[in-house]
């Protein structure tokens, strides 16, 4: 019996090790198939990778909670790569698609326990059909986590397949971003605008550049809004009532968000 327990533990350790190396692209193609066969891991199953990022102070419990939630399914693998991130490689049942995966993401979030500081997020990649593609789904989930935290910080679930324009901005080299911002704003940065101006701009975008609706929601007179937009046009040369200028401004704000996020990362 003791040897059985040892065997089971060794197999679990070997599987965990295999999945970690698979995610990090540390295996040759031939090794992937040989080791998967030895460990009785299905090579042609549909899978998707989730990343759960939690508050390190709460993480010890999160891993166990997620394991007890999903760990009963033999095709799913759950592993922690560092003190903040838990990786779930989920095997999909026939007919399961992204709508179900979004529900799984919500369940994972519940299991981990939402924290008030907003440091708990789940991101996931795309569905892959072969074991060798799992690392791609993992990279996509990683990117979704970054892009989501930069551009949709108010949400806590990020799907790689719906990152929108943020995905494009995230791939831009920082020097190019700086050049773009300088070209549009000169030595100013959109950050330099006061809170009132930024609130006005964001509300105006939310309401599809509709002056009446924006002024109503901001509880200000229409003329006050027009005055603010005129003032903005004077200082930037961009008239947000003109679609093309509005797009330029919106992208510039997103580029600045991205640059700020990259600065906060510990290099």
Language model region names:
Residues 1-6:
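Short, small-residue-biased leader/transition segments that mark boundaries at the very start
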Residues 9-23:
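Amphipathic HAMP/coiled-coil signal-transducing linker helices
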Residues 29-49, 53-267:
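Cytosolic nucleotide-utilizing catalytic cores of signal-transduction proteins
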């Amino acid at each position: 019996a003791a040897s059985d327990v040892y065997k089971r533990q060794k197999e679990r350790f070997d599987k965990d090790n295999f999945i970690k190396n698979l995610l990090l692209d540390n295996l040759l193609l031939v090794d992937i198939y040989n080791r998967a066969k030895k460990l009785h891991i299905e090579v042609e199953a549909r899978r998707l990778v989730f990343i759960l990022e939690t508050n390190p102070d709460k993480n010890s419990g999160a891993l166990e909670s997620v394991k007890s939630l999903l760990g009963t399914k033999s095709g799913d693998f759950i592993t922690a790569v560092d003190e903040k991130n838990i990786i779930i490689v989920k095997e999909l049942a026939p007919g399961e698609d992204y709508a179900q995966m979004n529900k799984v993401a919500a369940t994972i979030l519940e299991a981990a326990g939402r924290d008030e500081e907003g440091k708990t997020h789940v991101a996931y990649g795309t569905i892959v059909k072969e074991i060798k593609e799992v690392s791609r789904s993992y990279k996509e989930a990683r990117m979704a986590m970054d892009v989501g935290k930069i551009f949709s910080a108010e949400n806590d679930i990020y799907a790689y397949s719906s990152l929108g324009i943020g995905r494009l901005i995230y791939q831009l080299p920082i020097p190019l971003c700086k050049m773009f911002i300088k070209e549009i704003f000169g030595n100013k940065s959109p950050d330099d605008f006061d809170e009132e101006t930024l609130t006005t701009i964001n509300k105006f975008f939310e309401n599809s550049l509709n002056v009446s609706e924006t002024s109503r929601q901001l509880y200000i007179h229409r003329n006050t809004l027009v005055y603010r937009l005129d003032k903005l046009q004077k200082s930037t040369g961009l008239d947000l009532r003109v679609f093309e200028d509005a797009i330029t401004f919106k992208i510039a704000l997103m580029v600045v968000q991205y640059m700020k996020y990259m600065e906060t990362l510990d290099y």
